[in-house]
């Protein structure tokens, strides 16, 4: 009977599949990991921009401890106004990299493109350039007595590999559970991190990729960018 019904609906243009109870397959990355993080996870939002991730995380994890990093003077002023008084949101007007220091930062006319790198093609112009302070994830955790990171999100417009290298100690000690990282396939920035570099680095540090989210394509139809979710293999059940 089930087979007959399935074939009938298929001829009508409908396809029936079993409900997949694996939360990791949820189209929303934050809902995908919700059941594995508990009610008050520690989240690192690296490359906060205008606070988009703060809003998403606090909606799903209202009791989370969220450490947000944004080097842009303009963007940081905005997120301070919007989220400066939100409980357990810690705002840092710094960039994150593989070690402490400072580096020249490019502010674009569209803030989502702000980066240490110059664009490979011009759809937005640089309106300001200045040096910003950089801290590593490992140093920040050490200085602020942060025992672990449930979710490390990095969206830094090509600087992702540098961010991840700065979390090497935390990763090696299995103190990072999930990594949510922006990936470029097409050259968007000169000198950007490649997909293979990021994938290989995380694999070498014991992370398995779960899936991609929000694929974008070039005008020619080639893969341009996406976001990828990785899980530390020590947390796979």
Protein language model regions, located:
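Phosphate/nucleotide-binding beta-alpha loop and adjacent structural elements of enzyme active sites
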Residues: 1-237
């Amino acid at each position: 009977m089930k087979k007959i019904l399935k074939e009938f609906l298929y001829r009508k243009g409908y396809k029936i599949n079993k409900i997949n109870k694996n939360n990791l397959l949820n189209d929303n990355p934050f809902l995908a990991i919700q059941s594995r993080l508990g009610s008050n996870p520690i989240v690192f939002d690296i490359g906060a921009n205008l606070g988009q991730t703060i809003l998403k995380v606090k909606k799903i994890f209202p009791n989370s401890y969220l450490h947000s990093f944004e080097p842009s003077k303009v963007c940081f002023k905005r997120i301070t106004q919007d989220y400066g008084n939100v409980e357990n949101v810690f705002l840092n007007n710094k960039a994150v990299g593989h070690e402490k220091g400072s580096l020249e930062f490019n502010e674009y006319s569209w803030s989502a493109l702000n980066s240490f790198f110059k664009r490979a093609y011009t759809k937005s112009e640089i309106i300001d350039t200045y040096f910003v302070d950089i801290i590593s994830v490992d140093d920040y955790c050490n200085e602020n007595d942060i025992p672990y990171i449930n979710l490390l999100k990095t969206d830094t417009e090509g600087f992702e590999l540098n961010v991840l290298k700065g979390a090497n100690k935390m990763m090696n000690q299995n103190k990072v559970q999930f990594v949510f990282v922006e990936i470029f396939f097409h050259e968007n920035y000169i000198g950007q991190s490649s997909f293979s570099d990021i994938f290989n680095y995380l694999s070498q540090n014991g992370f398995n990729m779960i899936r991609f989210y929000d694929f974008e394509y070039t005008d020619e139809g080639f893969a341009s960018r996406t976001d990828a979710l990785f899980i530390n293999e020590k947390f796979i059940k």
